[in-house]
């Protein structure tokens, strides 16, 4: 085995881990929804879509055996994580500033009309308001945790893209 193969194998293992982390985060969201009765708002559902996209791209990238394919999927992961950062930051700003709204009247029908909301309504149907502040976990609101998660994923994937940029030429 050469360094190229070892690096690709290590990268694929990390991508598998990222995929499983996304599954765990989505399972945590379902736990909060069904056990703690914390209904998801439109921005919560959009964040779930971003975590799903990151997980799917991570699992697909873990199955690819060349750097170019891994690079393309890691780029898609970075784009999804950046979208998640923006959505979570907006959600957090709404919760930190009472009186603001996420535009439930306009956002809810759009989110609920997406195909996954029809296929998996228990996971992707809007049931709450963005202004509803649920009890913080370790002093941080839920959108804050999502923001931290998306930011960590974004930084890690961008660092990986930067670190392995020379392997694309090979």
Curated annotation (Swiss-Prot):
Query: From what organism does this protein derive?
Result: Burkholderia cenocepacia (strain HI2424)
Q: Which residues cross the membrane?
A: 15-31, 50-64, 72-89, 145-163
Please give the chief subcellular localization of this protein. membrane
Alphabetized GO MF terms: electron transfer activity; protein-disulfide reductase activity
- Membrane side Periplasmic: residue ranges: 32-49, 90-144
| Role this protein plays | Required for disulfide bond formation in some periplasmic proteins. Acts by oxidizing the DsbA protein.
Task: Tell me where it resides.
Answer: Cell inner membrane
**What superkingdom does the record give?**
Bacteria
List the stretches on the Cytoplasmic face of the membrane.
1-14, 65-71, 164-170
Against Pfam families, the record matches this protein to: DsbB (PF02600)
Q: Which residue pairs form cystines in this protein?
A: 41-44, 102-130
Please give the name of this protein: Disulfide bond formation protein B
| Gene Ontology CC | plasma membrane
Q: Does the keyword Protein biosynthesis apply?
A: no
PANTHER family per the UniProt record, alphabetical: DISULFIDE BOND FORMATION PROTEIN B
Look up and give the membrane topology term. Multi-pass membrane protein
Name the NCBIfam families for this protein: PRK02110.1
| Annotated keywords | Cell inner membrane, Cell membrane, Chaperone, Disulfide bond, Electron transport, Membrane, Oxidoreductase, Redox-active center, Transmembrane, Transmembrane helix, Transport
InterPro entries registered for this protein in UniProt: DiS_bond_form_DsbB/BdbC, Disulphide_bond_form_DsbB, DsbB, DsbB-like_sf
An example Gene Ontology biological process? protein folding
Which family, according to UniProt? Belongs to the DsbB family.
Report the gene name.
Answer: dsbB
């Amino acid at each position: 085995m050469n360094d190229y193969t070892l690096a690709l194998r290590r990268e694929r293992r990390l991508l598998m881990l990222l995929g499983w982390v996304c599954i765990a985060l989505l399972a945590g969201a379902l736990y909060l929804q069904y056990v703690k009765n914390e209904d998801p708002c439109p921005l919560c559902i959009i964040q779930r879509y971003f975590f799903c996209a990151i997980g799917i791209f991570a699992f697909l990238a873990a199955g690819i055996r060349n750097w170019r394919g891994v690079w393309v999927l890691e780029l898609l992961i970075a784009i999804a994580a950046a979208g998640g950062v923006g959505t979570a930051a907006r959600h957090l700003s709404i919760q930190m500033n009472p009186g603001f709204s996420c535009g439930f009247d306009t956002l809810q029908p759009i989110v609920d009309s997406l195909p996954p909301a029809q296929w998996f309504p228990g996971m992707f149907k809007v049931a709450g308001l963005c202004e509803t502040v649920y009890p913080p976990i370790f002093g941080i609101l839920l959108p804050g945790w999502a923001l931290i998660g998306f930011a960590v994923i974004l930084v890690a994937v961008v660092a990986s893209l930067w670190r392995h940029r020379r392997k694309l030429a090979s």
